[in-house]
Structures are given as structure tokens and as C-alpha cells.
């Protein structure tokens, strides 16, 4: 039996390297996914998200200054990216020091800047600070904040630079000064960084029988409702749980839609299908990007979903996280059409990456952990580790 398992696993891994057309989700549940998101520059003094920097919905609270001699100094890593210009006024290399998360985001932004303006590079004017030039709780003291410009110092570009920083995954972006853009990130050890994409156990799904059931009671093999590419209701089988932990406390984004009796709770890096004022259709979008006025797709009654405007977005903590995966990669949670996936802002890519698990669902009993075990599924953990190095510019 062990030999059989090894062979099966080898075949599954090999399939990831083969472009199998039938493994993809086709056009997806909401039409074609190839729209390019229109990038809208930030206005002077605008910040995204529209909450204070040190709140849960943004970069989170300060954890205290980091000094060269402190134990936490090892949390800072140097950034020698040749595509970034560091001003380094102090001539100490301090501006190159930052947290791992900040480094990932600024490296992603550097690529976006060169793609947007050929011949122009990203310029960091202020990074980690050890001289006390900022407010006492500034994230600059922790290597979690940067002040940035473009290498040509063209202030007409700064609004778009701020937008690119938002797209690169910075947790808070502020067009703070006409001389620079301020960006910051969550702490590397924060719950918002480490947690996967999930729903609370109290979230309700509609079963194929028509009854409603909380996710905490959902079982592998159950049939739930989702939609096809036209928005018509269809049923889909629950294949496994990508993440299941009834004891874990997580911060959820609470989304309330106009005329919809239920409220959706979802972790910040889970994918929802959203139409914003700057997009041409419904696109897979991280939950933390959702804003009032965006459109979601909801089910009220009848045989299909309808568009509804988001009227409220807030944060709420609950205990219990659940992430079921269906054969279609989508499902209705509390009446809102959602993706089963998180972490990478591409529903199609996530769906294709998990194709081996869907193809081999008939022999699931021969693979490890394809049951109701708690925690993150082993296959997803491997993909997440690989994605950190291959697709880091699209990850929260």
C-alpha cells in the first residue's frame, strides 16, 4: 500500500506541470475573467484602506521600537534589490532594513513601477528609523513602514505610485505628502498575515436538499448550492476542507449587502467576486479590498443570483475557521457567491492548482488527510510555500 500511495502522489504532482485544459474552471461563475483592472490614482491625502493605519483593518498596532541591540533586531532583513534606489541619508544602511513582509511588498512594487514607467525605478527615502525622527508609535521604528517616490521625482506620478502600492499588497497606503507616499504593513507575526482564507463555523450554506446548514456541521460528500457561469443555481459536491479549525480565533471582514438579510463574514485574504467602479465585471478580489458601493452577487430566492450593493464593511472576531472546497471551486455562503480559495488573487490559478485533488477524488481514501482532520490541508500548505517564492507579488 505505501508504494501505491507514492505512485499516486507522484502522478498528482506531475499533473501540476501539464497544461490540462479540462482542469480549469472555464469561464468561471461570473463570466470571463480576463478584464484588466483599471488603476485609479490616489488623491492627495487619501489613504487605503479608509481606516487609521494602526487599526486591525490596516497595518495593526505598533509592537514597540526595534533597536540595533534589541532581541527583535533579527526580525529586520536587508534589502539589496538593484531595482530599488535607497536614499540612505544617514549612510548607515538603515533604510534597507525592513521586515520580511515589507520586503516582499516593496520588491513587488519595484517591478510594477518599472512596468508602468520604463526607465524609472522605485526610490525609498525613509525605511527603518533609529534616530527618533517620527512619532513615538511610528511603524518606521519596526521596519514596517516606508516613504517612497519614483527615481525621477516626478510628482505627477505619485498618485499612481500610491495605487501601485495598494495593488502590490501594502496593508496601508497614504498619499501623505506631495513629496512622498507613505506605506506600511502588518507585523509578520500578526494573525492577519498567518491565517488562511476561511469562514466562521456559524456561516450558513444552502444544501442541495434546500435546507440550510452551518459550516461547522458540513461534511465531505455533502451537496451544496453554487452558480454556473450564467448565474443559475447548480449543486456542487464538497470534496474536502482546505482549512478547518473549530478552536482558532480569527479576524473576519463583515460585509453587508443592500436588501440582503444575512451578513457575510470572511477572512481578509479570501476571494470574493466583486464588481467595483473601476472594473468592467465581477472579478476575484481579496475581501479586505471590498469597499462600500462595490457590487456582490447574492441569492434571495428563485433560481439565480442578483447583484447587490455593499452598504457596510467592518471587522469582527469569531472563533472557528472553515474553508470547504467544492468540485466547482465556488459556493454560496450566507447567500453570497464566494470562491473556495484564498491567498493568491486569482480564482482560476487556484482552481487549476488544485486540479489533482479533484481528478483523484475517487481514490481520496488512498491519500493522506483527505478527511475531516483539523488544520490546513497538506496539499494546500505545499502550494502556499511554493507560491510564496513564485507568486509573492500577488499574495497578501
From Swiss-Prot:
Taxonomy of the source species: Eukaryota, Metazoa, Chordata, Craniata, Vertebrata
Transmembrane segments: none
Primary enzyme class: hydrolase
GO biological process terms held by the UniProt record: cell fate specification; cell-cell signaling; intein-mediated protein splicing; positive regulation of smoothened signaling pathway; protein autoprocessing; regulation of gene expression; self proteolysis; smoothened signaling pathway
Signal peptide: 1-22
Residues where Ca(2+) 1 binds: 89-90, 95, 125-126
Organism in which the protein naturally occurs: Xenopus laevis
Positions that bind Ca(2+) 2: 90, 126, 129, 131
EC number: 3.1.-.-
Keywords (A to Z) from UniProt: Autocatalytic cleavage, Calcium, Cell membrane, Developmental protein, Endoplasmic reticulum, Golgi apparatus, Hydrolase, Lipoprotein, Membrane, Metal-binding, Palmitate, Protease, Secreted, Signal, Transferase, Zinc
Top-rank lineage group of the source organism: Eukaryota
GO CC entries: endoplasmic reticulum membrane; extracellular space; Golgi membrane; plasma membrane
Site (Involved in auto-cleavage) residue list: 267
UniProt GO molecular function: calcium ion binding; cholesterol-protein transferase activity; patched binding; peptidase activity
Name listed for the protein in its UniProt record: Desert hedgehog protein A
Lipidation (N-palmitoyl cysteine): 23
Quaternary context: Interacts with BOC and CDON. Interacts with HHIP.
Amino acid at each position: 500500500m505505501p508504494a501505491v500511495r507514492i505512485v499516486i502522489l507522484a502522478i498528482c504532482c506531475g499533473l501540476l506541470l501539464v497544461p490540462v485544459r479540462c482542469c480549469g474552471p472555464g469561464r468561471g461563475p461570473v463570466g470571463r475573467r480576463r478584464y484588466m483592472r483599471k488603476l485609479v490614482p490616489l488623491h492627495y491625502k487619501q489613504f487605503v484602506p479608509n481606516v487609521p493605519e494602526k487599526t486591525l483593518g490596516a497595518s495593526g498596532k505598533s509592537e514597540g521600537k526595534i533597536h540595533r541591540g534589541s532581541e527583535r533586531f533579527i526580525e529586520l532583513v536587508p534589502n539589496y534589490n538593484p531595482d530599488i534606489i535607497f536614499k540612505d541619508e544617514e549612510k548607515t544602511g538603515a533604510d534597507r532594513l525592513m521586515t520580511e513582509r515589507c520586503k516582499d511588498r516593496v520588491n513587488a512594487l519595484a517591478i510594477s513601477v518599472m512596468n508602468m514607467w520604463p526607465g524609472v525605478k522605485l526610490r525609498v527615502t525613509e525605511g527603518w528609523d533609529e534616530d527618533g525622527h517620527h512619532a513615538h508609535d511610528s511603524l518606521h521604528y519596526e521596519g514596517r513602514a516606508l516613504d517612497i517616490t519614483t527615481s525621477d521625482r516626478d510628482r505627477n506620478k505619485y498618485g499612481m505610485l500610491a495605487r501601485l502600492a495598494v495593488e502590490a499588497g501594502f496593508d496601508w497606503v497614504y498619499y501623505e505628502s506631495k513629496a512622498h507616499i507613505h506605506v506600511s504593513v502588518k507585523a509578520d507575526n500578526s494573525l492577519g498575515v498567518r491565517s488562511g482564507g476561511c469562514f466562521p463555523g456559524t456561516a450558513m450554506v444552502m444544501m442541495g436538499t434546500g435546507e440550510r446548514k452551518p459550516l461547522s456541521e458540513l461534511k465531505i460528500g455533502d451537496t451544496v448550492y453554487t452558480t454556473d457561469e450564467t448565474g443559475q443555481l447548480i449543486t456542487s459536491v464538497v470534496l474536502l476542507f482546505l482549512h478547518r479549525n473549530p478552536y482558532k480565533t480569527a479576524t473576519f471582514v463583515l460585509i453587508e449587502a443592500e436588501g440582503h438579510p444575512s451578513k457575510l463574514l470572511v477572512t481578509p485574504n479570501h476571494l470574493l467576486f466583486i464588481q467595483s467602479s473601476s472594473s468592467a465585471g465581477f472579478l476575484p478580489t481579496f475581501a479586505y479590498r471590498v469597499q462600500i458601493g462595490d457590487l456582490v452577487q447574492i441569492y434571495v430566492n428563485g433560481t439565480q443570483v442578483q447583484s447587490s450593493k455593499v452598504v457596510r464593511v467592518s471587522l469582527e472576531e469569531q472563533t472557528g475557521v472553515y474553508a470547504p472546497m467544492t468540485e466547482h471551486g465556488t459556493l454560496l455562503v450566507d447567500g453570497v457567491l464566494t470562491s473556495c480559495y484564498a491567498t493568491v488573487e486569482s480564482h482560476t490559478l487556484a482552481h487549476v492548482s488544485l486540479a489533482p485533488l479533484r481528478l483523484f477524488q475517487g481514490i481520496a481514501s488512498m491519500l493522506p488527510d483527505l478527511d475531516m482532520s483539523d488544520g490546513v490541508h497538506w496539499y494546500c500548505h505545499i502550494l502556499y510555500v511554493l507560491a510564496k517564492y513564485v507568486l509573492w507579488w500577488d499574495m497578501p
